[in-house]
Every structure is written in structure tokens, then in C-alpha cells.
Amino acid sequence: MKALTKMHAIAGATLLTMVSCNNISESQKADIVLENIFARKSVRKFTSEPVSDKQVETLLRAAMAAPSAKNGQPWRFVVVNDKDKLASMDKQLPYARLDTAPMAIVVCGDLSGYKKFWTDDCSAATENLLLAAEAMGLGAVWTAASDEERSGIVREALGLPENIHPLCVVPVGHPDGDFQPKDKWDPSKIHYNQW
């Protein structure tokens, strides 16, 4: 399994390098990006292998590359890699599946500035984070934390100030198992020009 994970990491690094290279066609770039989007899946079980500091930085750089309303960039991130804190949060947030994750990234919005579209902006940042994890051979899953009960748990566990509101908790790690993406294409959900 470790060999497969390392192979994914190499493939992810290659993917990111290839997409930024100027010597491949626009069509090839599109194929690489779309393949990564369609390969993304929710991973809820992880090996004990840690996520490197460099990988964490890459994930956060990808998240911060997201678009935001009026370029407000309201996102704030809390990286949680303390095992005791993860275990404590796991007991109170059972859907977050933090029990095997070596780390989690909590995506939050700063409501002290332009806050009208903070959930949209932070959602875009979260999706970028998930796609970067996929490209790097890591696993991750978006778990909601914005409702009153869950946000209170996260706020207390992390000591968040009043102006910082959690959107989601994203456990990240090396997948333990063979997780497959789901084909969610459904043309019946598409309408043109009117309902």
C-alpha cells in the first residue's frame, strides 16, 4: 500500500508540474485537470503515515487560489495535527472521521470583513483543497461544521474567536483502502433557458 501511495504522490506532483508546463497543449492540460476532478472521492479511512509539511503547504496554497467575492479572501485555516485534539474532536464530530486521520484542516470564514458570500468563497477554497489532495495521492473528505451544534464544538475545541466561523472539517491523510469515485452525472438535473 505504501508503494501505491508513493506512486500517487509522484503522479500528483507530475500532474501539477505538467499542468503548469507550457510545452503541452491546452487539450492535454484540460484532460489532466478533468481526469483529476472526475477521480476525486471521499476518503474516510487513513494509514498512519503523516502528511508532510510541504504537502500541507501545497494544499493550503491550492485552497487560497480559489476565487472570492470582491477578492475578499475571507478564508482562514486551522491545521490540526495534535492526536489528542483530533481524538477529542472525533468523539464529538462522528461524521468527521478523525479517528484514523493524521491531520485535518478546518476551513473557516472571517466574518469581520465583507461577509455576504463567505460560505461561497470558503466552499470554493475547500473544493480546491480536495482536488489538490486527489492530485497529490492523498485522501480527504468534506465534513460539515457550519450548523450551530457542530460549529460550537469546533469553536470550543480550537478556541476560535467570535469573528471566525467554521465551515467544514477536512480530514486529510494517505488512503487506507481502495476508494473509488462515484459517477454522479445525471442529465435529468439540467435545464436550459428555463425550468
What are these regions (language model features)?
Residues 2-11, 17-195:
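Acidic, surface-exposed loops and disordered segments
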